[in-house]
Amino acid sequence: MSRFIFNRRGILKAGVAGGAALAAPMHFVKGAFAQDMSCNMPTGDTVTLGFNVPQSGPYADEGADELRAYQLAVKHLNGEGDGGMLSTFSSKALKGNGILGKKVAFVTGDTQTKSDAARDSAKRMIEKEGAVMITGGSSSGVAVAVQGLCQEMGIIFMAGLTHSNDTTGKDKKRYGFRHFFNAYQSGVALGPVLKEEYGTDRRAYHLTADYTWGWTQEESIKNTTEGLGWETVATVRTPVGAGDFSQYITPVLNSGADVLILNHYGKDMVNS
């Protein structure tokens, strides 16, 4: 793990640059490209972004981190508490005066790590609070659902933590964007490490979160490990937010597997 070093300043720089680049120039509408026809085009001196994150549910810890990062990015965009970071960017597009001269305001929603709740909160932020862009989320199921809504409403969706191949693959939308890597990339990147650390003669057992990310994560890791020569003993789906995984232990122990692969995230990963 020591080979991969991330520092706080570098992460913040990347986050602010990405957020500004995505938020600033994009105003799209279903079936139209004229800027003055954009959905929720701001007419005053502020522009509103919608931060749709899990504030409850099994991925709430990740949502809290996301929201803190978004709030910090807004301060940077508005030139509040920047600490001189913007001046270190090679691009000078960010001036600390908001987006295109408009001060950035934000509203928030709780996805609850549920697709229906996430759509409802995104719709409220768009229709009632004038959000010009929706971003956030820690579940690929949520990401797919919300980007579908944003497609219908002509609003940009910048996905948060979505790792499923399908977000910008099978379920891609014109108004949906991602900065996060996907499950395929994880599988390809892990291959050489797994071979070096564990060899090519292993028997793997998968416990997998039962939704789009878990499915594509399992598939991608299986493709990699089987390509190394590993045998896949079993793949077992588990509900998101299961909490207690003790019922799954005995089958794993009796399977003959010597590697357990947990395709889990958030509190489910901690518990499993």
Regions found by a protein language model. Give the residues of each.
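N-terminal export signals
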Residues: 3, 10-32
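Extracytoplasmic ligand/sensor domains, especially the bilobed periplasmic-binding protein
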Residues: 68, 116, 128-236
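Short beta->alpha junction loops
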Residues: 98, 108-115, 234-244
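Extracellular/periplasmic bilobed ligand-binding domains
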Residues: 150, 218-272
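C-terminal segment of N-terminal export signals and the immediately downstream linker at the start
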Residues: 26-52
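Signal peptide-proximal N-terminal region
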Residues: 68-105
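Short, well-structured alpha-helical segments in soluble
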Residues: 112-130, 245-256
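Short beta-strand segments enriched in small/hydrophobic residues
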Residues: 46-67, 204-207
